[in-house]
Amino acid sequence: MYKNYKISAPYFEFGPKAYLWGDELLRLAKVIDEAAIEYDVDVIITPQYTDIPLLAKHMKRVHVYAQHVDALVPGRGLGSVLPEAVKYAGAVGTMLNHAECKIDLETIEATIKRCDEVGLATIVCADTLEELEAIAKMGPNLIVAEPTALIGTGTPSSMDYVVSTIEAVKAINPEIMVLQGAGISKPEDVYNVIMAGASATGSTSGIIKAEDPCAMARGMLKALRDAWDERHK
């Protein structure tokens, strides 16, 4: 775990994947950044590697993360993603082990260690309870509990999954904040998962495929704030 990194609950992750880039991504990111300031929530955005400097230059409340890095050190490794390079580009962290970019547990652990050395926060995705427990023992900054089968479906995780995965991580390392992902398609989903005990949630298709992505993003961040405040009355 990179100890010099700070992010506060509740937080939100928007992953544009390969749907958005350049100016179109920047326009949406600016709206998200403004909403993050308005609702006093932290937001992670994981742009294409080439857009890291663009977003890092313009964001105030948004944390810019890489979509992935490799565990290599400077030297040979054509086609690989060097942790030092994404940090130099302006990223403060990286996602690892997303369902669309899976790596094995040994590689996850090695990459977390490299990121700790370089000074990058890590948000690591996990599908099953067993995978989640194994990753929690490696000490990432953040964990995404996300059933692979539900990604992009519009169907959120069951409340049993939400509660059990949060409890499992907290039993291993209470410092790790758990983001509940997969199937978050509307503000109501955001509200429900935060009320169930999550520190965070996120969305890709729910925002990108919305009739008005900017309005959907704002609505989700408002729901995040409302649920957190309701939970902590």
Q: Regions from the language model: what does each represent?
A:
Residues 1-81, 122, 130-140, 208-209:
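Conserved N-terminal beta1-alpha1 strand-loop-helix module at the mouth
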Residues 17, 92-103, 142-155, 196-217:
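Glycine-rich phosphate-binding active-site loops on the catalytic face of alpha/beta enzymes
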Residues 29, 33, 52-53, 83, ...:
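Generic structural signal for well-ordered alpha-helices
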Residues 58-64, 87-94, 117, 138-144, ...:
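Glycine-enriched alpha-helix->loop->beta-strand junction motifs that scaffold or abut catalytic
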Residues 60-115:
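Glycine/small-residue-rich loop that forms an oxyanion/phosphate-binding "nest" at active or ligand-binding sites
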Residues 95-168, 172-173:
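Conserved anion-binding
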Residues 111-117, 157-160, 207-233:
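C-terminal helical cap(s) of enzyme catalytic domains, especially alpha/beta-barrels
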Residues 126-139, 184-201:
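Catalytic cores of alpha/beta
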